[in-house]
């Protein structure tokens, strides 16, 4: 891998050459407009990005796997899938920009037909099948967005699709896959069990297996997101992409670095399953322990042999985000942007919102919102915990005399402060209160932490023992 400190003259020549390529190879007016704007990037005014952990690992002397995807492959993929996919907007957000300190845009792949970017790669793969392969049908193993992507792509092309999913898959995802006329087989308790069964069925019936990320055609299909980003905002300084197996970031990196070598491509992983970060640090594909995470769409224990060398060469840095940061990002996007995203879809914004990425203050940054297929029960928990941490949902445990009027007195205090009582619960047995007392729990909807403290102080002034429960 070439070091990141490439000379300005070499990079400007590369940009100029790439600009010429996209002008000659692409016919859309939007692409030609993007290429014209990109000529401004040939000015030798930028500084090379600092050497990242990715560059250090790639230069460690470990042998690199071959790169099996080209810019031309991504252009070809775009021509193939164009009529099947929605060119999602890259929406600038003044509100989020003010919150994060950068000029932030969201590439809303959650608006695709299946609710995620996955259909891009699946379509590109399925459209390349031979007549014999199409007749036999396709098979995939997935508990999430890949299942719906394959099912949708197969349905649009009149091909039978069989999807093997773990028995623990939420009913909503099973039904979502079945809506595209796929045959769903529930097998085992994990993805590994489902994958093994899918392999057995492939050999038995001659199906074509559609991998979730580790296939050159899948990578090229996902890379069409990068081409759209270049056309929609050719002056981007950085693009933030969630990483699972690496198919999306690999495709985006090839597409965008070909046209604009100075753009920063930053990957984001769940802290519980940092397989790409571990692999890059080791200089080879390294499997990590599979763990439960709210970002289940990027919980991949082992990255791909096709995706890894692309990330080694083109991705500038990889950061991680924890569960609380992801959950909070989901809530912020829903409340402030009216955008519903799943855990993996929120990972990129979580990294920006929590200032995990250096050097982007004041810069033009795009975050790829990869999907919006979140389980409703999980969303409800996220919202409730988020409201509790923000002080807008409060649980007060109060010891009161076990006599008529005690609860009414507390309720009057709460009403005076104009808080809303959501629930009241008694506990006369499992409490430290004396036999003449009882513990009452008030669940309140408030205006925030300061409002809660006012209520607590007022209750205490009336000689009640009150305790504010801390959120989990």
Stretch-by-stretch model annotation:
Residues 1-56:
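Polybasic, lysine-enriched low-complexity intrinsically disordered terminal tails
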Residues 3, 39, 43-472:
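PLP-dependent amino-acid enzyme catalytic core
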